[in-house]
Amino acid sequence: MPDINESMLNQFRPVIRRFIDPIADRIALPADYITLTGFLVACAASAGYASGSLITGAALLAASGFIDVLDGAVARRRFRPTAFGGFLDSTLDRLSDGIIIIGITAGGFTGLLTGLLALHSGLMVSYVRARAESLGIECAVGIAERAERIIIILAGSLAGYLIHPWFMDAAIIVLAALGYFTMIQRMIYVWQRLK
């Protein structure tokens, strides 16, 4: 039985690594440069959404997500991972997450309140983990981590493009709800570890 505290995609990580690692082995570019590239592509995705194009935003978001997976593999296999590299990756991931939601909201695909709730829930998911880790507790738990959140946005984008733009709004509502649920999961996990 799967652990409710475990990321939905965690079971696929070995499969993803088998696909990504051979690509990472061919890349000589330092991981930090790849991280920065991924962030710039996320900014372009946000601009695509803001301009009213679900398909452009989604294509660039998918590319950014792929680059994000790739930078970790490059750091792990081609270069020695560094503390700053991990810090940079995490910081730019948070910026990317926020700017994507801003682009979707600016493009009119979701309401202002829904967009703000999605931003807030994403912020709290990250904050709870950072605060837990400052207490010495590894807190990479929860049903909807970053990869799951990106997939939800991509699914909403595709359905919104092919069927009706309302699906993008629905995806952001789901994103906000799962963000708060993940935050609560992490709070309970930390409470159990500290009691």
UniProtKB/Swiss-Prot annotation:
Required cofactor names: Mn(2+); Mg(2+)
Pathway where this protein functions: Lipid metabolism; phospholipid metabolism
Subcellular location: Cell membrane
A Gene Ontology cellular-component term: membrane
Residues reported to bind Mg(2+) 1: D68, D71, D89
Catalytic activity as recorded in UniProt: CDP-2,3-bis-O-(phytanyl)-sn-glycerol + 1D-myo-inositol 3-phosphate = saturated 1-archaetidyl-1D-myo-inositol 3-phosphate + CMP + H(+)
Active-site annotation: D93 (proton acceptor)
GO aspect biological process, one term: phospholipid biosynthetic process
Bound cofactor: record note: Binds 2 Mg(2+) or Mn(2+) ions per subunit.
Xref: Pfam families: CDP-OH_P_transf
Transmembrane segments: 27-47, 54-74, 99-119, 158-178
Record's protein name: Archaetidylinositol phosphate synthase
Lineage of source species: Archaea, Methanobacteriati, Methanobacteriota, Methanomada group, Methanobacteria
